[in-house]
Amino acid sequence: MRLSQMLFVTLREDPAEAEIPSHKLLLRAGYIRRIGSGVYAYLPLMWRVLGKVSQIVRQEMNAAGAQECLLPQIQPAELWQESGRWDTYTKAEGIMFALTDRQDRQLGLGPTHEEVITTIARDLIRTYRQLPQNLYQIQTKFRDEIRPRFGLMRGREFIMKDAYSFDADVESLRVAYGKMHQAYCNILQRCGLKYRAVDADSGAIGGSGSQEFMVLADAGEDEVLYTEDGRYAANVEKAISLPVDAEPSGLTKFEKRETPGTDTIDKLCQFLKCSPTQVVKNVLYQAVYDNGQTVLVLVSIRGDQEVNEVKLQNELVKLAGKFGGKTVLALTVPDAEMQSKWASQSLPLGYIAPDLADSYIAATKDIHPQFVRLVDQTAVDLKNFVTGANESGYHVVGANWAEAKGKKTKAKSGEFALPDGVVDVRKARPGDRALHNPEQTLKTARGIEIGHIFQLGTKYSQAMGATYTNEQGEEVPLVMGCYGIGVSRLAQAAVEQSYDKDGIIWPVAIAPYQAIVVIPNLNETTQVEAATQLYQDLNAAGIETLLDDRNERAGVKFKDADLIGIPYRIVTGRSLAQGKVEVVQRASRSSTEIALDQVIPTLKEWIAAACPS
């Protein structure tokens, strides 16, 4: 392609809307154009990148035995109501675009396709002889993000590959899951990206286990915790670890103490001269279930730890049936306005004890009259701990848990009934010890999630009646997995991982073009002729090449070549007199003079080395 004929416009300044380097560079380099909030046009250079990423994805999926198809983007609400996810996606997470057609039928624009594919499997898969199956598509998805930002990282429409496997049993699912895991590793390696596969929370998709694939980048939205031995890595939302050991408490006598102005752990520990590991703090949450029921949750956790709200929400979803719901729509620390709707009296915030009386909850419609009491594992084994006294300005010291779990009254003075709900809701953090080897400590890195694979099990097949007849003649649910990778997100993540002050540094495998021939001076006939011949020969040899034949100064052309990130820049300049051209490698900035007849074999060698197969 000749740049003089391409719709090619670059910007010298960073657009005001862009926050992270990759977003700025894709806009400046003319790869994308903003059309609306979270909505972008893919311009010709970007479309070539997306085509290359899609082709690598397609090749690896096909190699793993998956079959390509295309599913409808408009989905009937009834399918999502069958699976129980309509309210979750239109109310709780609220990420589905919902619409009503002229017959007043509710529809959704597909953010994902579990319901559609399960319906197809229900209709077409009858017997174990048809298993296993794995279907995938590469398609535009839609999600109504609350705050679209970062360009293609969090947009309202994006290109995604989603695959769905159907197996006879859990063992076969694990085989399919393993194949997809390897396919994703192959995709990322072939795209030239540094990444980690990490344990992850399954969220609204559900299932028994999942992994995210994180492209490592300083601006990544996600925090990854990992061990240097390579045996553990997890998203911080899912990560588990061993906290530091609690220090033994010297406050062995139970008593109530006046502790004015100590409504934070730091202030309390300074006042009492104790370690935060000797404190049980009690954090109040407000959960709203999908049936409108509001539940107040009191979480007791060791004073040096923080609550992981993703883990907490998962625990509360498990309890949903107790309150007549299916899922949690909202989980918050209630502010003064929220408290005013249910609190019968002023709460002793900062001084709450594990036994805060249920009478603090006023008799109110749709408010559960009792606190849900949970205790994190970090607090269970504490002895002689410090905690609130349910009175502002006071704490108790030397407290213990009663031996009888779930006891409704204190066994004796100074003891608190241990809640029935003993859970792991603490946030793992860097420096914690690893479970698999306490000598290993967790390190931290930032990552961009570009892929997520799930072992769904029978969540959808049971809900939607997708069954098959097994070898024993029994009708049993299909066992499912689902596997997503963001094609457009991966492309921007590659930029976020690899750029410099001058522009993008594309991995060779997914660069829009592999080489660009630059004519410094259009008035020099020898430069124009040599460049044109090279351009034709390179393309004929299978090396995708641009020709910068614009009537611009050489400096402008060089800056644009750096900005758009083409891996190899070939300049027909002064060295032509010696039968050579200058070849600059974008990644290393190294410059080499190469004889004209050696340009093609040299570039072929470099490209082969840079593109793992």
UniProtKB/Swiss-Prot annotation:
Where's it found, cell-wise?
Answer: Cytoplasm
Q: What does this protein do?
A: Catalyzes the attachment of proline to tRNA(Pro) in a two-step reaction: proline is first activated by ATP to form Pro-AMP and then transferred to the acceptor end of tRNA(Pro). As ProRS can inadvertently accommodate and process non-cognate amino acids such as alanine and cysteine, to avoid such errors it has two additional distinct editing activities against alanine. One activity is designated as 'pretransfer' editing and involves the tRNA(Pro)-independent hydrolysis of activated Ala-AMP.
- Report the Pfam families cross-referenced here: HGTP_anticodon (PF03129), tRNA-synt_2b (PF00587), tRNA_edit (PF04073)
Free-text comment about domains: Consists of three domains: the N-terminal catalytic domain, the editing domain and the C-terminal anticodon-binding domain.
EC number of this enzyme: 6.1.1.15
Q: Which GO terms describe its cellular component?
A: cytosol
**Keyword Ubl conjugation found:** no
Coiled-coil portions? none
Q: Where would you say this protein principally sits, based on its record?
A: cytoplasm
Protein's recorded name? Proline--tRNA ligase
Query: Which HAMAP family does the entry link to?
Result: Pro_tRNA_synth_type1
Q: Which GO terms describe its molecular function?
A: aminoacyl-tRNA deacylase activity; ATP binding; proline-tRNA ligase activity
Q: Which organism is it from?
A: Cyanothece sp. (strain PCC 7425 / ATCC 29141)
Q: Which UniProt keywords apply?
A: Aminoacyl-tRNA synthetase, ATP-binding, Cytoplasm, Ligase, Nucleotide-binding, Protein biosynthesis
Q: Which gene encodes it?
A: proS
User: What subunit structure does UniProt give?
Assistant: Homodimer.
Which protein family is named in the record? Belongs to the class-II aminoacyl-tRNA synthetase family. ProS type 1 subfamily.
One of the GO BP terms on file: prolyl-tRNA aminoacylation
Annotated catalysed reactions = tRNA(Pro) + L-proline + ATP = L-prolyl-tRNA(Pro) + AMP + diphosphate
